[in-house]
Amino acid sequence: MIIMTILSLLLSNAVTLRRDISILFNRIVIIALIYCILHDTMSLSIISKGVGLHGGLLHITNITQVFQIFIFLISILILQLTSFDPIKKFYIMRHPRFINKWPRAIGYSIPLSSIQAVLKDYLFKIQGFNKEHLKIIEYPLILLFVICGAVFLMSTNDLVSIFLSIELQSYGLYILSTIYRNSELSTTGGLIYFLLGGFSSCFILLGASLLYANSGTTSLDGLYIINSISDVNDNMTSWYKSYYLNFSLLIFSVGFLFKVSAAPFHFWSPDVYDAIPTIVTTFVAIIAKISIFILLLELVYHTNNYLSEFSWIYGLLVSSFLSLIIGTVVGLTQFRIKRLLAYSTISHLGFILLALSVSTQSVESTQAFIFYLIQYSFSNLNVFIILITIGFSLYGYVWNNKEYKNLLDINNSPVQLISQLKGYFYLNPLLSLSLAITIFSFAGIPPLVGFFAKQMVLSAALDNGYIFLSLIAILTSVVGAVYYLNIIKEIFFYSPGHKLKTVDVENTWPFPVKRDLKLNDSNAFSISYDRYTVSSPLSSGYTISSPFSITISIITIVILLFIFMNKEWLSMGTIMVQVLFST
């Protein structure tokens, strides 16, 4: 279904130059992904322990099917950001004072719908609302390539197909990062991402070459068999072979740690996150990591050597330790919101890698890994959607501070500084509460879902003897709460630093009367004529559209009310782990 949709979009893009049908293409892709979810859901009972495809290049199991559905769902939620107009209406449109006074003011009858359309168009122009993200017809097509690469990567069973899948996913992300052609900052971020992403691919290719040189096969099943034989044989030659296989896997894993921005290979992610548009950052920060971690889970499960003196898993433990330290300490110095989220992601990757490293030693540790990955993906998605929504809601406001006026690429990334959220609670309390709940979940505050995820990881690590790393994880969680609370302080404990824009319209008003169109500082919309003034309260400027509101509400409620439905979530995780261990 994904391949058919890609071909259809390629043909459609080739025969049309209209940029305004991008929304239609996005909605078509959403429908296709919904169909994929239904198809994969119905095939879960058929696949059972696994099905090999294309001569063993792909291996489809229940665990890969479940995470395919998860990726499709996340992609749908991200695609709806560009599939619907984020602004539903203006409060003025149906205000009775406005409707009653308008005929007296202009002196003749004009249909109210025409007046509303004109005013809406003028308000978009006055307040600088930018719809560029709704006019990129290549956007859904490139997203499908990324999704296709992610699905193949999770299901691959061969070293060659691993490399091709990760490159298909990565090149789509490189193009997405530079898709806003008029943004110099976005182009710079995309170039950094491309150069360092290509460098990380060299490690993957080198590791795959060493694995082939030491095993004589590119099939993962063959590698698993050789690894299991080296476990049961105790002679020197077998140990020597196992050592080189583990060394090759270590180099192989370095490339993937680069891709997910785990420390010490994290240095590219804060710059790239901050430079590319926020909508693209959402996809880069979530989808690319899910597929890689599921592949690493399979590799860890089948290649962890209990009898060897050296295991490539030690590299994951070192990366976990460095991610916890660097993501927390460096995050304390950040004042740009997306750079802060980048370091927050690095810190959370420390927990994920810790759970991954011990995932083969007990069912509980694998369950902790899967649960943490799922909940963090949803929480991270919610934060980015809320930031995008806040950016849309602030288009009608200006800041007097000079540092805000010097921000680059403000149209594609409206919220860049933490201080831009100052006093936002007084502008939109519900959206502020949703952001606060999600941030508290990041910090691991009970009874939110993030607390239970961290508790499961720490419990699994302690049960398997990783006391030192568990202590580091606890300390970094406490310290990391500082920069999360700093965001809360800016939102709730300061007065708003925003003012509504005030604009006069001259010589372009379409009706033959003298006019003056304003958005004034008293939160009121007014139109002045020769003898009459029509005014109406504007409340908070924009009303966010229903798809945005519903998505934020559902994810926030799940995060908040997890304590009341934890059995369902944990039962689902247990079933997935049992499926994995039974294959």
Curated annotation (Swiss-Prot):
Q: Which reaction does it catalyse?
A: a ubiquinone + NADH + 5 H(+)(in) = a ubiquinol + NAD(+) + 4 H(+)(out)
**Organism superkingdom:** Eukaryota
Task: Kindly list the places in or outside the cell where this protein is found, as annotated in its UniProt entry.
Answer: Mitochondrion inner membrane
Q: Tell me, what is an example of a GO biological process annotation in this record?
A: ATP synthesis coupled electron transport
Principal subcellular localization = mitochondrion
* Alphabetized UniProt keyword annotations: Electron transport, Membrane, Mitochondrion, Mitochondrion inner membrane, NAD, Respiratory chain, Translocase, Transmembrane, Transmembrane helix, Transport, Ubiquinone
Q: Its topology with respect to the membrane?
A: Multi-pass membrane protein
TM region(s), chain numbering: 28-48, 67-87, 136-156, 191-211, 247-267, 276-296, 312-332, 340-360, 380-399, 433-453, 465-485, 544-564
Membrane among keywords: yes
Q: Which GO terms describe its cellular component?
A: mitochondrial inner membrane
Broadest EC class assigned to this enzyme = translocase
EC number(s) stated in the UniProt entry for this protein: 7.1.1.2
- Function in brief: Core subunit of the mitochondrial membrane respiratory chain NADH dehydrogenase (Complex I) that is believed to belong to the minimal assembly required for catalysis. Complex I functions in the transfer of electrons from NADH to the respiratory chain. The immediate electron acceptor for the enzyme is believed to be ubiquinone.
Q: Which family does it belong to?
A: Belongs to the complex I subunit 2 family.
What PANTHER family does the record tag this protein with? Answer: NADH DEHYDROGENASE (PTHR22773)
Spell out the protein name for this chain. NADH-ubiquinone oxidoreductase chain 2
Gene of this entry? ndh-2
